Design a protein with these regions (language model features):
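Amphipathic alpha-helical recognition patches that constitute DNA-binding helices
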Residues: 70, 104, 115
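Conserved GNAT acetyl-CoA-binding A-motif
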Residues: 98-109
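Conserved catalytic-core motifs of GNAT/GCN5-like acyltransferases
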Residues: 108, 124-141
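Conserved acetyl-CoA pyrophosphate-binding loop and the N-cap/start of the following alpha-helix
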Residues: 79, 83-91
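Conserved active-site alpha-helix within GNAT-family acetyltransferase domains
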Residues: 86, 111-129
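Acetyl-CoA-dependent GNAT
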Residues: 11-78, 95, 99, 146-148, ...
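A short beta-loop-alpha structural element at the N-terminal edge
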Residues: 1-9
Length: 161
């Protein structure tokens, strides 16, 4: 994730009820730090989303274990609700598989966000539990997908550190 992309991400504002996903107030320098787990999804030079992996993909409150690689992300707000989530998340998972070779992926999604839950279920994720975040008290769903064989694709070319 470049500094310019990170500066863009921290301005993204989603409509209610998805505004809990806003990154306003986040430090763009942290997102752009090569040591962080944040990566930009770029299409023809334009930032369309981001994906985070490891600790940066977690919500505080779930039991931390290494049975799966945590991943989170976001799509540019004006692109949400247009059926792009599956391709964006799928591309991110391909990238994560190539880069990290995890035994499984784990996503944590706000319980109210049924739209995102449907998308990840279509990508093979299954429920692993529910918890309340320690920082906000919000309810979250945890879904896991066992690792599959690496696919062939150009996902690595679309992701930028």
């Amino acid at each position: 994730m470049t500094a310019d992309f990170a500066a863009d991400v921290v301005t993204w504002c989603y409509p209610e009820p998805y505004d809990s996903n806003d990154m306003t107030g986040a430090d763009p320098a942290f997102l752009a730090d090569p040591g962080s787990g944040f990566f930009a999804l770029v299409d023809d030079g334009a930032l369309i989303g981001f994906r985070s992996f490891g600790d940066d993909g977690q919500v505080p409150g779930w039991s931390d274990d290494d049975s799966a690689l945590d991943t989170g992300g976001g799509l540019r707000p004006e692109l949400t609700g247009q059926g792009l989530g599956r391709a964006a998340i799928g591309t991110g998972l391909e990238f994560g598989r190539e880069r990290f070779a995890p035994p499984a992926f784990r996503v944590t999604i706000a319980s109210y966000n049924v739209r995102a839950q449907r998308v990840v279920a279509a990508l093979g994720f299954r429920s692993a539990g529910r918890f309340a975040a320690t920082d906000s008290g919000r309810s979250y769903e945890v879904l896991v997908r066992p690792e599959r064989r690496p696919g062939r694709g150009q996902s690595a070319n679309r992701w930028r550190k």
